[in-house]
Amino acid sequence: MNRNFLLYTALFLLSVGLNAQDKKSNMEKLEREIQKLVMTSVQINNFYVDSVDTHKMVEDAINGILSKLDPHSAYTNAEETKKLNEPLTGSFDGIGVQFNMLEDTLVVIQPVPKGPSEKVGILAGDRIVNVNDTTIAGVKMTREEIMRRLRGPKGTNAHLGIVRRDIKDTLYFDVKRDKIPVNSVDAAYMLTPRIGLIRFNNFAQTTHDEIVEAIQKLQKEGMKDLILDLQQNGGGYLQAAADIASEFLEKGDLIVYTKGRSVPDQEFRSEGGGIFTEGKIAVLIDEYSASAAEILSGAIQDQDRGIVVGRRSFGKGLVQRPLEIPDGSMIRLTIARYYTPSGRCIQKPYEKGDTKGYAQDVLNRYNKGELTNADSIHFPDSLRYQTLRKQRTVYGGGGIMPDYFVPLDTTKLTKCYREITAKGIVINANLRYIDKNRDKLKKEYSSFEKFKKKFQVPDELLGEIYAEAEKQKIQPADAAEKEKTDGNIRKILKALIARDLWDMSEYFSIIYQDDEVVAKAIELLQK
């Protein structure tokens, strides 16, 4: 082990963002402390009674240091860093299929439109049984292992063996790997003749472009007012949030600002010229909406551009700077805090080093009744703020508090349904059903509108699910739970079938048919 590695790394990290005087003073102090760590590591490596994995020892030391800071400063090794960054880069290299595993066999749900697999003729329902002469079907290979074989550098070939329904012999395709987009937008469709909904799952490099494209699509379909669904959106890039906010706000409007100890304060303002600056907006959030999702919803709320509906957001308002280490690993170090235009700090309170308590915050909210009862939420006067145009009262203290609270419906899904879905019984039943009936369904339902209106989940399919559940000792407690579980299963099955025949917009169109948060947003926009 290079005994100077820890010293040089620490001094480099310390020097980032400090002025000259602070650098000199702090570096002198830290150099003395780091020598202890270096000497300890060297002595362990040289003299400890057993052999030691010095690489792991250093990683554990870094994790130990960061764990004493805030909940979001973190270290990731090279492999973890690559996986973490992939959803935010907007693409990866692969063959371009969406798939699920059915009884140890990969079943193609959909080839990515215009992707490499679609170009060579791979179809929905195909089973990929081997990759480059390696059998992947029926061998209990993990999903991660299969993905490693399907992915590879752009331009390389994947030789695939395909089993197709009603064709006896295995088919073989050579697929040239290419850049495969990782889309942020899950759904974009019209809820009413005037109101459109866009749901997206993160804030990546391509998210702004996807949102603009989705808005343009819905405007062509008659959209005048918009619901932005940020429920369960964990955030992503700050710049993506600022770019999206600019599509709704006037030029110069403050979106968010940051304040830190060793970095300059920074403001992000709307660039103006947005694509949707007139219509009404409702933003949907919940306890899992975080980071960039809170920046966007906070800006729309504080600038009185729209209303926020749902439950208090997660409360992640710490700015991380990614600090790359030469071996491909990375430290994400908190350097500042986010503040909404009205001055609210997005970050919820935390105890340094108490990562367990921080992780249980949502559970604590549930136990205290915050997710189910608005009367359980109280704010001191010190946490009251005013919006910038209408001077409406909004609340700080961590996260974004919605203008209109919609409680979590804890009785909507039965215990029996949750157990059945957790075992994968519904997913597998859907895969078998769509595999047998895809062509028949496409012929019978030429449009999604017809499917949504007329399709009913067959009783036999429901019976298959209950039969498999009984084998796994899962049963409804009584007739009332059975009836409610029937409804839960029929709804998710219809949505999954719609997804497999069309796409995710059709899936959410069914899932959201009786959703209380969406219904409340529609009601408010129609006033």
Q: What does each model-identified segment do?
A:
Residues 292, 304, 311, 315-383:
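Polar, glycine-rich mid-to-C-terminal structural blocks
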Residues 45-83:
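N-terminal, post-signal-peptide region of Sec/Tat-exported proteins
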